[in-house]
Structure formats: structure tokens, C-alpha cells
Curated annotation (Swiss-Prot):
PANTHER family: S-ADENOSYLMETHIONINE:TRNA RIBOSYLTRANSFERASE-ISOMERASE (PTHR30307:SF0). This is S-adenosylmethionine:tRNA ribosyltransferase-isomerase. It is found in: Cytoplasm. One of its GO terms (molecular function) is S-adenosylmethionine:tRNA ribosyltransferase-isomerase activity. Its EC number is 2.4.99.17. The gene is queA. It comes from the Bacteria. The keyword Transferase applies. The lineage of its organism: Bacteria, Pseudomonadati, Pseudomonadota, Gammaproteobacteria, Enterobacterales. It is an enzyme of class 2 (transferase). One of its GO terms (cellular component) is cytoplasm. GO terms for biological process: queuosine biosynthetic process; tRNA wobble guanine modification.
């Protein structure tokens, strides 16, 4: 399969730079996986699409203010983007500088350069940085960090982004990008879903900066997926198995929930799905056999991204590309702060040939 098979024309005017004033007021494009039929509506239509006993699986990761500015003590300006927190004093990060710092280099971070840190080691494209400070890494980031808005939201972060670029149910700090499908859920909608009898469960996948890395190979099968830490606890496993047993659907909110659930299913030895606490490099593209997820809530993704490949594996390649074409024609808003899709699984997707 060629990466270019997943390309589509997107006018820049359709990239959302700010979210809707109300989280749940965005538009919703529904795609029926088996038939490819499309329905246009608003996000709160989810209430009519979900049945009592269906299980919504959310990702409760919390975005950390992961972007730091500063300079090397020796002079040059640097920009640090945290990939993950290693412990209370150390991070693994991407560093942008005219000349990469060497191990032992002293870094002065924060807009006022008040935080002292040391680059201790290099791991491929990533840098290990230790903070010489009595505070924890998280406290330091909350104090001097900027929200790591995706590169296509081409503006500096604002104070409001600390709340807007965060789901209302976020709980566990560690992500450097929001699980964006979840941004559309507000408390009133969650309350109505609960009142209808929709079940809810929470996985954790700390989204890494790798999620924005372009696929740099021509052939999909050659792509090496970035690694992210995921947790699928026992209560989620129990909820999934119970939903399946009573004939209800498991509905993943976002591609990160999909990747968490399907990673746990892939690693399971005895059951459909078992608890999972580990790094995952799962790469889902057409031909992938889904085991757990029956329906998906997701935003519109970048052309040629691993996420549009994941959706194509779920709904079918042709149905997905047709839906994206319709979304562009109907002027849906794209990417992290944009509109959403509700997609049901297409069991024939696994047999579809792509790019022929």
C-alpha cells in the first residue's frame, strides 16, 4: 500500500484554529460502515445513535504544558517539546536548536530562563533532560510550560487553551497532545448519556509528539510506529466483556482509545481482552483485524496520516475516502479543534484492496 493512497485535497480554510464556543455544538458526520451511507448532523445526535447498555470508552489522559523555550548556557536558543516524563526529575524530549546540545550541556529554560536543566544523554532523535530543581517535573511544566498545540494550529498558545485543549474528564497527566475526539463531550451531554443507560469506561494512553510525525516512507508496511504508554485496567476489561456478552457495542472515543483496546486484545493470552499496562507501537492500517471496537467517534485527520489509515481499516478505504471528500465539499472543520465523525464497523473492510 502506498502512503499517497491516503492523500486528499484540503483547503487551508477548513483547518480549525479555535474550537466551537460550546464543546458539543460541533457538526457530526456519521458513516455507516457496512453501506458507506453518510448522514450530516450535530454532535449531540450521538444521544440517538447510542443504545442503553452500549459502552463508551474514553481516554482520560491529561495534556501537560509540554513546550518549553529557553537557551543553552553557551548561547543558542532552544525549544524543548516533552515526549514523556521519565520520573519526577527527568524528561525525554525533542529539542529544536541550531546546534543540538551535547551530553552535559546546561540549559536555561522558561521565558525568564529561571529553570536550570542538564542534557544528560541522547536516545536517537530524543534527548534525556534532568532538572536541577527541588520541584517535580510536572510542577515545573505547569509553571513555565506552554500548551503544545499541534503544528497545523498555526498560532501561539493562549491561556484559554489550557482548558480548551483538554477533555472535561482528563485525569492522568502525561500527554503532549489531546485525545481530540473527547474534546466534544461536555458535562450536560455526559449526563444525558448516563441517563439513557450508556455505560462508560476509561483507558489511559499518553499521546506522544510522534502522533504529529509525518509518515516518511512511500510504502505503508515500511513505517515504524512511534511508541506510547497505555493502560487498560481490569474494570475496563470487565466492562468490555460484559457489553459484548449482552449484545451491546463497544464504542471507542478517539483513535487513542482504539489503539489502547486493540493493543490489550492483541496481547491477551486467554480472553478476548485482558488488562494491559505497557508501551504500544500498534499500527492499524487496512487489512487489520479489529477484535474489540464496534463503533468509533473521531475527528477528521491529516492526509497521509496513520490515523486516516486506522479509520480506513475500520470503515473501509473507499467509504473513508468518500466520507472525507464529502466533508471537504460540505465544509466541515478539520483536525484537533474541528468537527467529528461517528463510524460503525465495516466487517468487509479487511478484504478490501487499496490502491488497485
Amino acid at each position: 500500500m502506498r502512503v499517497t493512497d491516503f492523500s486528499f485535497e484540503l483547503p487551508e480554510s477548513l483547518i480549525a484554529h479555535y474550537p466551537m464556543p460550546e464543546r458539543s455544538s460541533c457538526r457530526l458526520l456519521s458513516l455507516d460502515g457496512p453501506t458507506g451511507a453518510l448522514t450530516h448532523g450535530t454532535f449531540t445526535d450521538l444521544l440517538d445513535k447510542l443504545n442503553p447498555g452500549d459502552l463508551l470508552v474514553f481516554n482520560n489522559t491529561r495534556v501537560i504544558p509540554a513546550r518549553l523555550f529557553g537557551r543553552k548556557a553557551s548561547g543558542g536558543k532552544i525549544e524543548v517539546l516533552v515526549e514523556r516524563m521519565l520520573d519526577d526529575k527527568r524528561i525525554l524530549a525533542h529539542i529544536r536548536a541550531s546546534k543540538a546540545p551535547k551530553p552535559g550541556a546546561e540549559l536555561l529554560l522558561g521565558d525568564d530562563e529561571s529553570i536550570n536543566a542538564t542534557m544528560t544523554a541522547r536516545h536517537g532523535a530524543l534527548f534525556e533532560v534532568g532538572f536541577n530543581d527541588e520541584r517535580s517535573v510536572l510542577d515545573i511544566l505547569n509553571s513555565i510550560g506552554h500548551m503544545p498545540l499541534p503544528p497545523y494550529i498555526d498560532r501561539p498558545d493562549e491561556d484559554a487553551d489550557r482548558e480548551l485543549y483538554q477533555t472535561v474528564y482528563s485525569e492522568k497527566p502525561g500527554a503532549v497532545a489531546a485525545p481530540t475526539a473527547g474534546l466534544h463531550f461536555d458535562e450536560p451531554l455526559l449526563e444525558k448519556l448516563r441517563a439513557k443507560g450508556v455505560e462508560m469506561a476509561f483507558v489511559t494512553l499518553h499521546v506522544g509528539a510522534g502522533t504529529f510525525q509525518p509518515v516518511r516512507v512511500d510504502t505503508i508496511e515500511d513505517h515504524i510506529m512511534h511508541s506510547e504508554y497505555a493502560e487498560v485496567p481490569q474494570d475496563v476489561v470487565d466492562a468490555v466483556l460484559a457489553a459484548k456478552a449482552r449484545g451491546n457495542r463497544v464504542i471507542a472515543v478517539g483513535t487513542t482509545s482504539v489503539r489502547s483496546l486493540e493493543s490489550a486484545a492483541q496481547a491477551a493470552k486467554n480472553d478476548l481482552i485482558e488488562p494491559f499496562f505497557d508501551d504500544t507501537q500498534i499500527f492499524i492500517y487496512p487489512g487489520f483485524q479489529y477484535k474489540v471496537v464496534d463503533a468509533l467517534v473521531t475527528n477528521f485527520h491529516l492526509p497521509e496520516s496513520t490515523l486516516i489509515m486506522l479509520v480506513s481499516a475500520f470503515a473501509g478505504y473507499q467509504h473513508t475516502m468518500n466520507a472525507y471528500k464529502a466533508a471537504v465539499e460540505e465544509k466541515y472543520r478539520f483536525f484537533s479543534y474541528g468537527d467529528a465523525m461517528f463510524i460503525t464497523y465495516n466487517p468487509q473492510a479487511i478484504n478490501e484492496r487499496v490502491g488497485e
